[in-house]
């Protein structure tokens, strides 16, 4: 038996990676006294493949080492030995011609089979011929055939109770994994596995179960994957959807409708206008439409496999553009508290009416009433704030027009006063009222003081002519009859107040009389 290092130079070893590892270790003997161990690389081997029993930590100065089948060291179980002093190897009775021994203590197996699955023992004698033994074992697994997926129904219909897929062939000591569209499947509410995961069952079939299913067979040494299995779930059609959603169109525009319904296989499409078949396509196009094209448009879809059909109906109305309306008014100049009626006239039918005041949408008050169709506006009673420009707007779903403005003038009623006072006017009224009250109080105090202080004050009071008028009742002090005089003063106050509705008898002037008696 030749050394593996010599055979490697002639390129006769097929498993290049393992041989390179063993060869490198031949020239790299660790300077250590660690325990001798052996690893199987790989520990799980596919039949007819190779395995390397890789030795570690051989003594630097060993004499000889042996490889045996099993754990008993009898001569019949010897595979090979290596004698360091002679730098040569020698085969034993258990040698099969598939083994290669290396000077670093490793053993290489080619074309392993299930019978090779056992323990192997390395026995090393150090420089003093002390024996050192260690064992290793590897497992051999069959090569896996490419699996194949079969199903009880490759075209199930949505809603069917179940569909089953099977991964074949069956192999001992093999696990099976499933995926759909490249994503792993796990057991759930509608997904069950049986027969060691070889059978996949989908319950209550749904359209989402549609896709490509793969089965993977795997053992500790290798794996293999099936070709995709196409599960094509039949369903539909769903209720068709017509787009765009518009149902009102302008006369002269183009009508372009499309219909879509989710269905497998794809549904057949038919268009009906006012229940008459028009075309058997997914789209409907009519150019330069008129009001005669108004009506019901139906999309009918049919699935020839499921035998199901669905219909969606759309009512479409074609409108002409509206013309400009006009306003008729009973009177453009109205007295306050009177009434006025405005009427919006249009040649168009089926239109909506909206009123504008000073170019803004009219805010209705409790004095305003509209007719049922909004075409007539009545204001009663009218007030000065109702004066302004009035317009009416008519519209249909595709157009609108606004009338020319009508100006309404309101003649104020003088009895109604000025309904709107500025802040300055209000402040003036308040100040005037307060000043009047203060003046009255001062005068009353003055007269009271004069009365309690003596008659000499009478002359002083009557001397203030700009603000009072003085009158003397009875004879003067020079009169022989000596009749007591009665003096009185008249104060007139006239305060400006806001113009508010008052009765005709009300007077803006108030007179205050003060009487002073002389004792």
Curated annotation (Swiss-Prot):
CDD domains in the record: IgC2_CEACAM5-like, IgI_hCEACAM_2_4_6_like, IgV_CEACAM_D1
Annotated positions of the Phosphotyrosine modification: 488, 513
Span of the signal peptide: 1-34
Single biological process term from Gene Ontology: negative regulation of T cell mediated cytotoxicity
Location of Pyrrolidone carboxylic acid modifications: 35
Record text on subunit structure and interactions: Monomer. Oligomer. Heterodimer. Homodimer. Cis-dimer/oligomer (via Ig-like C2-type and/or via cytoplasmic domains); induced by trans-homophilic cell adhesion through an allosteric mechanism transmitted by the Ig-like V-type domain, and is regulated by intracellular calcium and calmodulin. Interacts (via cytoplasmic domain) with calmodulin in a calcium dependent manner; reduces homophilic cell adhesion through dissociation of dimer.
Free-text note on domains in this protein's UniProt record: Ig-like V-type domain mediates trans-homophilic cell adhesion through homodimerization and this active process is regulated by tyrosine kinase, PTPN11 and PTPN6. Ig-like C2-type and/or cytoplasmic domains mediate cis-dimer/oligomer.
Annotated family: Belongs to the immunoglobulin superfamily. CEA family.
Protein name in the entry: Cell adhesion molecule CEACAM1
UniProt organism field: Rattus norvegicus
């Amino acid at each position: 038996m030749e050394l593996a290092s010599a055979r490697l130079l002639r390129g006769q070893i097929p498993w290049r990676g393992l041989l390179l590892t063993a060869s490198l270790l031949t020239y790299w003997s660790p300077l250590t006294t660690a325990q001798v161990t052996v690893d199987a690389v790989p520990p799980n081997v596919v039949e007819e493949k190779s395995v390397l029993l890789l030795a570690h930590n051989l003594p630097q100065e060993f004499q000889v080492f042996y490889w045996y089948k099993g754990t008993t060291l009898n001569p019949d179980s010897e595979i090979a030995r290596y004698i360091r002093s002679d730098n040569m190897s020698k085969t034993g009775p258990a040698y099969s011609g598939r083994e290669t021994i290396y000077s670093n203590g490793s053993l290489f197996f080619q074309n392993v089979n299930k019978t090779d699955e056992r323990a192997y023992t390395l026995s090393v004698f150090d420089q003093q011929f002390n024996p050192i033994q260690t064992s290793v074992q590897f497992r051999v697994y069959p090569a896996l055939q490419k699996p194949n997926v079969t199903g009880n129904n490759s075209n199930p219909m949505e809603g069917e109770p179940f569909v089953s897929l099977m991964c074949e062939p069956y192999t001992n000591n093999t696990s099976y994994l499933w995926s759909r569209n490249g994503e792993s499947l796990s057991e759930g509410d509608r997904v069950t596995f049986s027969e060691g995961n070889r059978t996949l069952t989908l319950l209550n079939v749904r359209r989402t179960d549609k896709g490509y299913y793969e089965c993977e067979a795997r053992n500790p040494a290798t794996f293999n994957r099936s070709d995709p299995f196409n599960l094509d779930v039949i369903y539909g059609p769903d209720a068709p959807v017509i787009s765009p959603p518009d149902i009102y169109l302008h006369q002269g525009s183009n009508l372009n409708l499309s219909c879509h319904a989710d269905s497998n296989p794809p549904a057949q499409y038919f268009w009906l206008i006012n229940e008459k078949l028009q075309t058997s396509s997914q789209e409907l196009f009519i150019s330069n439409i008129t009001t005669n094209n108004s009506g019901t448009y139906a999309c009918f879809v049919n699935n020839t496999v499921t035998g199901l059909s669905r219909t969606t109906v759309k009512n479409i109305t074609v409108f002409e553009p509206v013309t400009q309306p006009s306003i008729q008014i009973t009177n453009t100049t109205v007295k306050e508290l009177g009434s006025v009626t405005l009427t919006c006239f249009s040649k168009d039918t089926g239109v909506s009416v909206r009123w504008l005041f000073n170019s803004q949408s009219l805010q209705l008050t409790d004095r305003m009433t509209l007719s049922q169709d909004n075409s007539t506006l009545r204001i009663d009673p009218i007030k000065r704030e109702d004066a302004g420009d009035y317009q009416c707007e008519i519209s249909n779903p595709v157009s609108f027009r606004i009338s020319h403005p009508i100006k309404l003038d309101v003649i104020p009623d003088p009895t109604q006063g000025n309904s709107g006072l500025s802040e300055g006017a209000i402040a003036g009224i308040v100040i005037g009222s307060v000043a009047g009250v203060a003046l009255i109080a001062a005068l009353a105090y003055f007269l009271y003081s004069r009365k309690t202080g003596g008659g000499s004050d009478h002359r002083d009071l009557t001397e203030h002519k700009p603000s009072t008028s003085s009158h003397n009742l009875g004879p003067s002090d020079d009169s022989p009859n000596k009749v007591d005089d009665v003096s009185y003063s008249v104060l007139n106050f006239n305060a400006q107040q806001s113009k508010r509705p008052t009765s005709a008898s009300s007077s803006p002037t108030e007179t205050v009389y003060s009487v002073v008696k002389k004792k």
